[in-house]
Amino acid sequence: MTKPLRIGIVAGELSGDTLGEGFIKSVKAQYPNAEFVGIGGPKMIAQGCESLFDMEELAVMGLVEVLGRLPRLLKVKAELVRYFSQNPPDVFIGIDAPDFNLRLEKTLKDSGIKTVHYVSPSVWAWRPKRIFKIDAATDLVLAFLPFEKVFYDKYNVACEFIGHTLADAIPMQSDKIAARKLLGLELDRQWLAVLPGSRGGEVALIAKPFIETCQRIHQKHPNMGFVVAAVNEKRREQFEVIWKETAPELKFIIIQDTARNVMTAADSVLLASGTVALECMLIKRPMVVGYQVNKLTGWIAQKLSITEFVSLPNVLAGKELVQEFIQEECHPDFLYPAMEKVLSQDNSELIDRFTEMHQWIKKDADKQAANAVLRLINKETAE
């Protein structure tokens, strides 16, 4: 009997859990008995991944914040190295979480295990010299965006552009009315979606300026509805506390675990920079982006940055399509006028551009990723 394909895999946060889920499904479509073990969230676990640690262990935001968790992170890494050394997989996949996964990948690669990093770190945006560490740590990088492969090719680092899983998952035209019915929102009301981040550290810094921005919007648009996407119960409770402290008179409808549906149901979106900005672009909703981290983390990031933009719609376009306000500018004095502009202008040209970009990165990424990894480990891929 042939030994089953065995894949080590580590995802560090919610977006990585979703990528891992699709990757596992695509591999299992060709190798139903394939085994997956490492660190995953609920979606990966539901697909049969054995998670040795809680994924929350790795969900740490910012350079400064990581320092406080460093002893625990080092212990988790050591345990994973020990496990994979004793039980070598056919390949190891690190999904995002580069500060953790690249170190783990380097150790595993040095021990003779083939390694893949899924989701390119933003070497094209800041700390470009990281590409040499990536080269030393990996046998292959799987990149979502076309300009990332161009960057890797320049340095002769193995990389495949696989398209973006979100571009595959989200339809070219999203159904606003169906989403409102699904969420129980009034069909004929104007809705603003508020997404203050998926991590505790993000919500702690971003929720208040977002709520204060909504206060100002409410003064001019008293019939505007505000719907908040909370990724889990912890983030829901955290947002509620900040809401009651900041603007208890304002009404928010908080909906858990359905960020995509919340954005689809909305007319416009106020969101924290990250994967959700790309998702919002693919849903074709006009947006304003705000983001804030610890001041020292922000200062370091600014010094090391080599790109003009933070949000992916702007990076993809190579110009400002959506307004973004980072650090001190993530404040209602900036966010409100930008949001007011979105609410009052004709956004049809923006939506057309979003549609073009959607088509550009739609390539069946789950299958592309699985096939790239299977090629790496010399398995015959199905057509």
Swiss-Prot record:
Pfam families: LpxB. One of its GO terms (molecular function) is lipid-A-disaccharide synthase activity. It catalyses: a lipid X + a UDP-2-N,3-O-bis[(3R)-3-hydroxyacyl]-alpha-D-glucosamine = a lipid A disaccharide + UDP + H(+). SUPFAM superfamilies: UDP-Glycosyltransferase/glycogen phosphorylase (SSF53756). InterPro entries: Glyco_trans_19. Keywords: Glycosyltransferase, Lipid A biosynthesis, Lipid biosynthesis, Lipid metabolism, Transferase. HAMAP family: LpxB (MF_00392). Condensation of UDP-2,3-diacylglucosamine and 2,3-diacylglucosamine-1-phosphate to form lipid A disaccharide, a precursor of lipid A, a phosphorylated glycolipid that anchors the lipopolysaccharide to the outer membrane of the cell. Belongs to the LpxB family. This is Lipid-A-disaccharide synthase.
